[in-house]
Amino acid sequence: MSRPFALFNASRGSVAELGGQVLSRALRSTLASFHGCGESFRHLRSMNLLKSLAAVSSVTMISRILGFVRDTIMARIFGAGIASDAFVVAFKLPNLLRRIFAEGAFSQAFVPILAEYKAQQGEEAARTFFAYVAGLLTLVLAVVTLIGVLCAPWLVWATAPGFADNAERFELTSSLLRVTFPYILLISLSSLVGAVLNTWNRFAVPAFVPTLLNVSMIFFALFLTPYFDPPIMAMGWAVLVGGVLQLVYQLPQLKRIGMLVLPRLNLRDRGVWRVLKQMGPAILGVSVAQISLIINTVFASFLVAGSVSWMYYADRLMELPAGVLGVALGTILLPSLSKSHASQDVDAYSRLLDWGLRLCLMLALPCALALAVLAEPLIASLFQYGKFSASDAAMTERALVAYSVGLLGILMVKVLAPGFYARQDIRTPVRIAMFTLAMTQVMNVLFVLVLPLAHAGLALAVGLAACLNAGLLYWKLRARGFYVPQPGWLVFVLRLGLAVCLMVAVLLGLLQLMPAWDTGGMFERLLRLGGLVLAGVISYFGALALMGFRLRDFSRKAVL
């Protein structure tokens, strides 16, 4: 098990370096497009957005690469069957609650108000406010964690009812859930600390935190699985240890900015009630997205064994670009937009959104097409070893192609949704999310029960729903005048379109020259995959350069 890990790890540096060069070039080009736009752009530059985004994206890239190391090891050891399905469900449930309590509704309500306290009342008031909010969050999550541990079998039955037909799978999932559920408390407190650090422009430390979970899971998978019965239980404990590491790692940085305080309860505090008031609709909005994921798991639990795992591994691949760019942009834009709104700088607010949208389109469009075209090489190179069979690889490829449809929409939502949250308008995204949820279920029924798409139909429904969500958010921002596009969008999009067409043609041509992807060892497959990725990057950015895409062109107001 250690040898494939070493081979994969050896190639990690070149992949990260390549990704960093591509990202750096795109960031410089996009940000430079606003040079010379007057006082508003100088205000944007003062925020050090480029530096912050590059730092967060680079650290996130490392975390995602380690995540692939983790998933490759897990696929080799556990394959795609009863054990892996049980772990995916047991890990998904606390993650869903984490997104609701911490990274979702809570951060949407907490960050703008914390930024307001810091800007208008000073750091002492912000520190007291943080202590009160931390106390309330700790109490609520402790109760939720206790209920989750005690009610694990009922939670499994509610979220994966198809597992009830197999007693072994049901019991294993329940046991894993009891171990992983306390992760919700640890990671939510970690996310709270990260939100404070982001507000103080300490973006890199919270961005590095997910790496610790991956390190914990890799260590347990490689060295401790023989000591657990069944071996998959090692991964449950790895999640719990990872949660502890994620929280503890950030505390010294919190102390450094003078915000390390003991949680306190004060339900009479006006700021706490403002957060609770904002969290009401925010929880509903975030819950809509998580309910959609739960419903997808319910559908998948009735499909053939392995369906949950196939969707999981495909989703992990899609999460690489979504995490490196989407999470980084969302992390930086929310506090930046909140500050612009608090200072009533309408022009800077709109330009921040335009900057994010251009960057998303420039990087998400080629990534989405590359995921679809390179689905077979990606799955075979990263996962098709050991117990992960050729059939598992083929099923995962179908899910990845379906997921890739929604990558652009997912990334756009990461930019557009903060445009509402920063204005403390959570109701609009909630209404849109509820409509999107309803349409997702219509598509689930159509793609799974009417059309023979099985698990790929569930992935396709998620992707199309993300595009619908992004489209509606964009329409609302434009209709309310919160966002006014900068000049040059039409030519910008046309040139990107031509560049991605050339990239796809190059990739398809090279694929015809490659031997079968189920032959050769991991190192050989990764070398071939790296060659394809490099060819795609060169053809895409080379085409843009041939069409006049130059850094000096971004010194004008008209972009491209």
Predicted features along the sequence, with ranges:
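Membrane-embedded alpha-helical bundles of multi-pass transporters/translocases
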Residues: 41-560
